């Protein structure tokens, strides 16, 4: 669809390049309920005539929800939480990764307020804006109708219902796919220990868990931003980069050139082994 002539289907990263073409389209659908999707929907809304907006905004998340910015909430991005997450069973970690979407896929509260204010302003004349905002929806398939329209096959995750949406343009604010490590680590593949989902196992020091025949030689492979499944939501967070790097260097040198604090959060994640009396 992206390469189809006459059918504007663009990724959010290219939105500004194609903005004029999108604004000229009759009906526009924004797919994606994160910050990019929200900003694009707001921009389109502000530049469409009142009562003739013809905008759909859909996303897979259960709600158009704000990003978790509270100070205690942000303690999920600390070494304390990273260590706690790593200690959990694999199936629990996987459930948490999906459940914690609001820690990194939410929307700035100011943007949500601006969208609501703009929609409300358009009701002051007694009408209702021609917009549809529906969370909890995934796009199953998509195809062209004739040469200038697009049909999206939608499924509501909670209702388990399906429908079709015909639109003139689509903006895909769906993020970027993480690149798999397989090609980079192809030479090591026979030696990499994997979890139940065939993902590389990574220890608490950010080392790939390799066959003992490799580690016995003193060889190790360290990774950063490839360990969300083992270290949690903070894996790609730049705020933890210095701590990750220091952890790796301390392990490499078998010394402690970088002194790291033993506690970094006021929250105690999990029950302590020795209860307080």
Please annotate each region the language model reported.
Residues 1-35, 39-277:
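Flavin (primarily FAD) cofactor-binding/catalytic cores of flavoenzymes
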């Amino acid at each position: 669809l992206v390469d189809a002539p006459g059918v504007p289907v663009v990724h959010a990263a290219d939105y500004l390049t194609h903005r004029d073409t999108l604004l000229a389209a009759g009906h526009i659908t924004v797919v994606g309920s994160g910050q990019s999707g929200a900003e694009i929907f707001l921009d389109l809304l502000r530049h469409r005539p009142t009562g003739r907006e013809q905008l759909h905004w859909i996303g897979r998340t259960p709600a158009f929800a704000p990003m978790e910015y509270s100070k205690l909430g942000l303690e999920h991005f600390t070494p304390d939480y990273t260590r706690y997450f790593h200690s959990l069973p694999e199936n629990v970690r996987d459930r948490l990764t999906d459940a914690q979407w609001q820690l990194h896929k939410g929307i700035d509260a100011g943007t949500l307020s601006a969208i609501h204010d703009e929609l409300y302003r358009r009701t002051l004349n007694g009408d209702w804006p021609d917009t549809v905002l529906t969370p909890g929806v995934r796009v199953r398939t998509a195809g062209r109708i004739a040469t200038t329209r697009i049909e999206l096959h939608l499924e509501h995750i909670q209702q388990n219902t399906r429908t079709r949406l015909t639109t003139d343009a689509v903006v895909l604010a769906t993020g970027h796919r993480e690149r798999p490590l397989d090609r980079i680590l192809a030479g090591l593949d026979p030696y990499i220990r994997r979890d139940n989902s065939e993902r590389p196992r990574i220890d608490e020091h950010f080392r790939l868990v390799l066959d003992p025949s490799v580690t016995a030689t003193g060889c190790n492979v360290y990774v950063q931003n490839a360990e969300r499944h083992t270290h949690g939501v903070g894996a790609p967070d730049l705020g933890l980069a210095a701590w990750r790097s220091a952890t790796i260097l301390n392990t490499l040198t078998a010394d402690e050139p970088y002194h790291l604090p033993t506690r970094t959060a006021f929250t105690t994640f999990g029950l302590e082994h020795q209860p307080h009396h």
